[in-house]
């Protein structure tokens, strides 16, 4: 079935989750529900629905070194292997989409997710994110590149506005995402909660 064959209501239902960690099935179209799990450093799967931050009820899982640490080696093969290992674990847990890797740049020391991002450099970020994505997807599990774009703070992240000129946006903030998408071809891209120059992602 092609997306062009779906009605507006059917397309809308594809964007609606059954809960925080599952997509909604559309049985009449042969589309099954998809289980998702957070996973930039290890598969964080919920035993049951938790709060929006997922701070409770996580199952035990393998935890790999953070992106900031793995980036120190500039080793794309290592990131591929980490991604593949996470993909295998996801398959064993019935997870079809891993929410990771994170590809934002570290532009300030107070960003609450600096550990989750690879680097200040868009080339290194994009290449390593692409390798991770290819590794995950080599096991038949989708990877979701996040948080597009300019997710630079956790404080009031749902209402913040990242203001920057177009050259900085293109050459720095979007370049890593561009490389990750072109070279990694992720199954999905997660938008950020913040606005960029007044427009929400």
Model feature map: region roles:
Residues 1-201:
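Glycoside hydrolase catalytic-domain context in secreted enzymes
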